Amino acid sequence: MKRFLLTITSALVLSAAMAFAADSEEGFVQIFDGKTFNGWKTATEHTNAWSIRDGALVAHGERCHIFYVGDPKPFKDFHLKVDVMTQPHSNGGIYFHTKYQSEGWPKGGFECQVNNTHSDWKKTGSLYDICNVAEPSSQDNKWWTQEIIVKGNNVTVKVDGKIVLSYNEPPGAQPGKDFERKIAEGTFAFQAHDPGSTIMYKNVRVKRL
């Protein structure tokens, strides 16, 4: 009887966990198919920095950004989830509220840092030069899920479900001269930072809020 009850309890726990996982992904849309660059456009510089391998966008090479162009409607309030893995000493980033730019570091929007062991002290989850995280919350050579949630004037960043940053943009904030870093609207982009960095991005999904 005890074994029977234990089996039922285990089944109920598993069922609840599966239901929670399904609910947590409800409303999300995949924006990278894992096979092609459909819906994505690279900058015009160093385009060979980008490839697709094992279902992931792979960034390795001189500076080049790849932008999501698959939806003409800009994203304002949203919840973005990306599975990320870095090799040691790599630097990269996930941009939001940005727009296509043919070369250079993107001026529009924010960069959410991807960096566990690169020499730059601003680590994974930082809103670059706005609200920085000094301690890494993820590890090289292991996949993690990086989430960016924008609602109103708040930006929340999670790594594997744990909040690593919550930023409230102050009233009257103005765009910067060189880099705007101002909550507005726009698209997403990933960064290939330098030849010494290798970063994989996959399972890219987003939900409008």
Q: Residue locations for each model-derived region?
A:
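Positively charged n-region of N-terminal signal peptides that target proteins for export
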Residues: 1-4
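Carbohydrate-interacting regions of secretory-pathway proteins
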Residues: 20-209
